């Protein structure tokens, strides 16, 4: 392929560069170090090392530029810094993301008016809040006996800790006040506790937020068999004789299209673009794009009572500082929402000029609700209309059921109760964010125990009836969840990557054995 920056053939082609795609690269680098790997990302590299969280960029102007560069076809549109700033009827994306231009709602449906995506190396992990709670109760996938070990592996890859904000002023106080109204009757694992976060501290005590760079790790970056190609749009997965055979990729710099052969293909985009690519490739299992689910989100704010300024250091470009803390109210089947309680540096609503805010005393509360899963909730594709990348246009069909509305009503009452327990509410009533605001879209390439038409892939994430093709990302999660899905999605990616590594290693051993027999 003269003039191409891409290899003619690799062992594994990975589409996407978010946490799950990066988990495949990491596990393969660790467990199949001889395998050649090519990773393709449609967006540009916006941080250093590639995939790093933009919050780690200290210069505000450079950070803003990285966010704009991640917004793909939506670059230049007006954004909002927090989901709670989106008022009813307004469609604005958060920095680093962009919204669907059309097809996000249809008459008689709720739709997903603020469904968003990112196009950059690292995907949304360059912009996320880094919350990594473990699933509980019916959030857990019942047919994976090794799920707990896989979650441990995901913790390792993401660099998860519950100690990032140890010693933050008022964080103990917030948890104590929440626990007083939450913990009764709950098992220890489901009581109020610090939020597990993918973040660590430098030697100078500064915060470093995990992005895909942390998931990849040095073992991937130093792997001579691994290559990352940015500004590269994969337009088709190639299938020969029913088996994955490679990808067709368009170089966004030159416009030229190239074929890269591969023994395995991993499609690790988001829950909207992964099924889009499979559809465009003619790979269309019955469940593809179906069981789409978002987490309805309710937000509220309170102010801590009886606290004084402790004069800590200011924030460095994020909503969290040394005065901050993040408390977690875990999901339970009895209370089917996940609580994320963050101490903020500023009030989300105006306060009196003579009433200065004590840093860390403003508490933002959010409850995420598990969806009532429906087969009819789906992202469909229109072959007659193309999106900004020339791919089949997305058409989202999505409704909140009666049960969803009942859970939302419960969540609204609960968040007010929690807000009053913490302090003085800053607003009269909670605000329900528009569908899509959670950014936690799942189910569109869902995993299943058997090929029964209700799932897209096996417990190893291999697409049914297409050997060698694997899917990754939040879309693989088959259960209704309220907790942040990244940890679970990375755990599932670890399982799939190990399946590929095992097969590659087995094939290598067989080849070496055959060579010895010939000699």
Curated annotation (Swiss-Prot):
It comes from the Bacteria. FAD binds at residues 41, 118, 120, 124, 129, 131, 234, 474, 486. Pfam families: GMC_oxred_C (PF05199), GMC_oxred_N (PF00732). Residues 55-64 have a biased composition (Basic and acidic residues). Binds 1 FAD per subunit. Its cofactor is FAD. The active site is at residue 440. One of its GO terms (molecular function) is flavin adenine dinucleotide binding. Keywords: FAD, Flavoprotein, Oxidoreductase. The keyword Disulfide bond does not apply. PANTHER family: PYRANOSE 2-OXIDASE. Monomer. This is C-glycoside 3-oxidase. It comes from Arthrobacter globiformis (strain ATCC 8010 / DSM 20124 / JCM 1332 / NBRC 12137 / NCIMB 8907 / NRRL B-2979 / 168). The gene is carA.
